[in-house]
């Protein structure tokens, strides 16, 4: 694999300093030779040393020696720009290699930026290069290292970013591009353009589909890396692109395509919310899917799981049975339903025992203790018997009155 390219000439000047007296060579010439002839009869200067025959024969040799002796000490080269610790933890740092033009601005959240990206491992092995990578700033379309560092750049700037794996591909790594697990990365980023994002209301049907699909694919990538917060954010952005008000007419086919895409995003959003234990939000997402597609197996299954996580076994079991009826061979639904039936039986047993305890365990009458008479009967039984007797008398009176 290729390693990092050398910095460009402007970057080298920024890091090492520009050379002094760039026009020095124009001092050589005929006039210098004439000056040398005029000085030939003078004794050598002790503090400068006598030139050799070869040096004296070169045109302008004494002039060059004189200028070298009288030339002021060169100014020290400016130190390279310090690294900026973006988050203050040393895990994400940025250094400007080539500054942006004077007056250039920084991009804002929500703008679409285009960058030239070169990505390498810490050992210098280049793993990816994207000459025209475009993404919406702040939408989590790319790794966090880019989303957090690009807002600190000016348009036209080139910067080096070093990032811990936490802000790149994490413990899972990546297949494409291939990134090993827990790999820190070096990014060379050039911010080329920054433009306002699209007006969702003015998007055509196909443009909405394309935008929503991009956000959904970003969510899928985050989900596969077990970054469920970012996955949920991407799915939510996809749904927003689909459901926002439209000022452009769409065909029936486009509306149907958007509806199918919305269902996919809601299902994936519910899966992410389940992973985050956000049960109420997951329940809302599943319910929205079932409003459009009452027989959607994924939504039925996830809704049943959400209710089960909340302890609502009586509601969860019929929903899972409905899902199993739609797909009888699904082993996952079979296993989940069997588990819930057992949990429901255990829950009922616990509830029965609790009710008996609250009512004084009526299934077993207390044994008579020696030395105790009728007063040993609990007061609640006496009160209950009295109430029943009074009720019977009242009922008899009513019947007699009617007759």
UniProtKB/Swiss-Prot annotation:
Its cofactor is Ca(2+). TPR repeats lie at residues 212-245, 263-296, 297-330. It comes from Rattus norvegicus (Rat). Its main location: mitochondrion. Residues 110-195 form the PPIase FKBP-type domain. Binds the immunosuppressant FK506 only in its calmodulin/calcium activated form. Residues 28-39 have a biased composition (Acidic residues). The gene is Fkbp8. Its EC number is 5.2.1.8. The keyword Membrane applies. The keyword Transferase does not apply. The lineage of its organism: Eukaryota, Metazoa, Chordata, Craniata, Vertebrata. This is Peptidyl-prolyl cis-trans isomerase FKBP8. It comes from the Eukaryota. There is a cross-link at residues 240, 262, 264, 275, 298, 305, 325, 331, 339, 342-343 (Glycyl lysine isopeptide (Lys-Gly) (interchain with G-Cter in ubiquitin)).
